[in-house]
Regions:
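N-terminal "domain-start" segment
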Residues: 1-94
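Acidic, proline/glycine-rich low-complexity IDRs
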Residues: 1-27, 35, 104-160
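Soluble extracytoplasmic regions of secretory-pathway and membrane proteins
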Residues: 76-105, 112-116, 126-128
């Protein structure tokens, strides 16, 4: 037979772990990656917000509220840094993909518009990671911007 105590423990571990946060929604533990996540609206578009379950929950939620209260400002800063760091690379990729055909240069504005926010990850110390779908700037790779609430966006790279 199967140990009933063990079965009870297993059943308990399968139950969803979640909590509600005003203004952000219901965070649910995603056990496969070890983080709490919710889907929120960022400038009218859906985006995942997540933080590692080992981080201080209250601090992470405070930092999410800080970002959410000034979405437009943070969005412009993060996209602006990504364009500053990656625009030349995007134009190199565009030239390569057209192999000799004349292609219009991608502008900073076009680059920023094509980025589609996928997720924001926050840490208890105020560090953050923004993950974007690339709008085919890099043939379907991700754009990853890291920084902190204190220093703003600092690094951007193409990944995946």
């Amino acid at each position: 037979g199967f140990d009933p105590d063990l079965k009870a423990i297993l059943e308990e571990q399968k139950k969803p772990v979640s909590f509600w946060e005003d203004g952000l929604g219901t965070f649910t533990l995603n056990r496969s990656v070890g983080w709490f996540e919710t889907e929120a609206e960022w400038l009218g578009q859906p985006a995942r917000l997540d933080f590692d379950r080992d981080e201080n929950r209250a601090d992470c939620l405070t930092h999410f509220h800080t970002l959410m209260e000034r979405q437009e400002e943070w969005d412009q800063r993060v996209r602006g840094l990504a364009a500053e760091k990656l625009l030349d690379l995007a134009n190199d990729w565009a030239q390569e993909s057209e192999e000799g055909r004349e292609t219009a240069e991608i502008t900073q504005e076009q680059f920023m518009e094509r980025m589609e926010l996928d997720a924001i990850q926050i840490y208890e110390d105020g560090a953050f990671e923004f993950w974007f779908n690339d709008g085919d700037l890099f043939w379907g790779h991700s754009i990853h911007v890291t920084g902190s609430l204190t220093n703003g966006p600092e690094e951007a790279q193409m990944e995946g």
